Amino acid sequence: MDEESLQTALRTYDAQLQQVELALGAGLDPSELADLRQLQGDLKELIELTEASLVSVRKSKLLAALDGERPAQEDAEPLALQNAIAETAEVPVAPGAELETVPSRETGPGPTERGQEEDDGEDEEGGAALSGRKVNAPYYSAWGTLEYHNAMIVGTEEADDGSPGVRVLYLYPTHKSLKPCSFFLEGKCRFQENCRFSHGQVVSVDELRPFQDPDLSSLQAGSACLAKRQDGLWYPARITDVDSGYYTVKFDSLLLKETVVEGDSILPPLRTEPAGSSDSDGSDADDPSYARVVEPGAANPGTCSSAFAGWEVHTRGIGSRLLAKMGYEFGKGLGRHAEGRVEPVHAVVLPRGKSLDQCAEILQKRTRAGQAGVSKPPKCRSRGSGPGGRPPPRSVFDFLNEKLKGGAPGAPEVGAAPPGRSGKEVYHASRSTKRALSLRLLQTEEKIEQTQRAIRGIQEALARNAGRHSVTTAQLQEKLAGAQQQLGQLRAQEAGLQREQRKADTHKKMTEF
């Protein structure tokens, strides 16, 4: 509704309220008086809501009128701001030089002190003149994103690099760390640097931009925005409805409910999508707040010998797909200038149980050996395996093992194991054989259970189809006969594996001392 409709409705409600009040003073029945009092309360509440809507519409019109006058002032504000800050930051050199040329016995300490006091007074006056001025200041988030927020200057300070700077407080805080501390503004904050709220941020003068009033004319249903909540923070949201200066917004966070706000509690998003026009391309080319677009032929892709995302063959990672969605091109380095490393970081497996110093010595020895070209001969798996090697010493346990196996020393059978195996190797072989037998026995038992379940299912199907379908019954009987035959074979296989397992256990007990 526009302003005229609201004013007409307000006059109508006032006239109705006067009629109700006259009726109440006429002395009617108690039952009618109760209805009239309820109607009187409803009319008063309706008048209050209409007046609030009228105030909101007038406020929106006033903001729109101010937005039309702002562009003419914005052109002169940046230059005036730069000049004002430069004047406060500069130290007058000429008067000091003149005072130094005059002999000290003639001038005395009085003029010098007065000059310093005047300089301090000028600095304080300049800082006081800048305090309260609104600007557009940069803010680097915790994850490295550069954003420009509307802020207010609270004083002049020197930046970290020595350049002139100002301390600013952000007007539309999106995080708790940006929300101004109310006690700091009063000079009563006890936490100082440990305060979880903002005490201002020192920004270089060169990074400041002119203050930008929020443009609400571009906001409509479906537009992204920032909406203010009761905690004083601005959260990302999306407009679902616009009605007479009131905006119904739905927050991006699922924990926040849909709400209705006025025009002073809503903002366009701080980071908008680029329009893609040629004018903006030229102005943003040298802006440090935008990432530089690297042309395909401009950047040196480097040499990448390793297969990109080759490690994902062995994992379930989605790193390569995420990088591709974020605009990464194969062969280029990471970073906005594509200057990062190209080769992936190779994993180095260090010896187990060694200190870092010992690992460093081992790596140095390997490096020196590789540079000198020294190649060590491969180690033999067992002594005496080659021709002319010395036979291993024999013990009582080797003699017992040979006797229990039925073999004669010095006359091995064809296809038998070489006589050079010690008792420890025989023990390891029997252990691996026992593990393989246990695995085969477990698989056979699982197959037996599956076959038994299949037989039970076929028998149930035969019971259901008995005397109904002769063809189906014949097929089921054939399946049942085949399943029973397979079950018999599996049981025979299970018995054979159990015999081999018992034989291995007996062999282990007889050969292990």
From Swiss-Prot:
GO MF, one example: DNA-binding transcription repressor activity, RNA polymerase II-specific
Positions in coiled-coil regions: none
Cell location: Nucleus
Extent of the signal sequence: none
Gene Ontology terms: biological process: negative regulation of DNA-templated transcription; negative regulation of epidermal growth factor-activated receptor activity; negative regulation of transcription by RNA polymerase II
Chain ranges of zinc fingers (C3H1-type): 176-202
Composition bias, Basic and acidic residues: 497-513
Modified residues annotated as Phosphoserine in this record: 278, 355
Keywords, sorted A to Z: Acetylation, DNA-binding, Metal-binding, Nucleus, Phosphoprotein, Repressor, Transcription, Transcription regulation, Zinc, Zinc-finger
Main localization (coarse): nucleus
Region annotated Disordered, chain positions: 90-131, 267-296, 367-394, 492-513
Keyword Cell membrane among UniProt keywords: no
Pfam family, one: zf-CCCH
Modified residues (N-acetylmethionine): 1
GO cellular component: nucleus
Purpose: Transcription repressor that specifically binds the 5'-GGAG[GA]A[GA]A-3' consensus sequence. Represses transcription by recruiting the chromatin multiprotein complex NuRD to target promoters. Negatively regulates expression of EGFR, a gene involved in cell proliferation, survival and migration. Its ability to repress genes of the EGFR pathway suggest it may act as a tumor suppressor.
Annotated protein name in UniProt: Zinc finger CCCH-type with G patch domain-containing protein
Originating species: Bos taurus
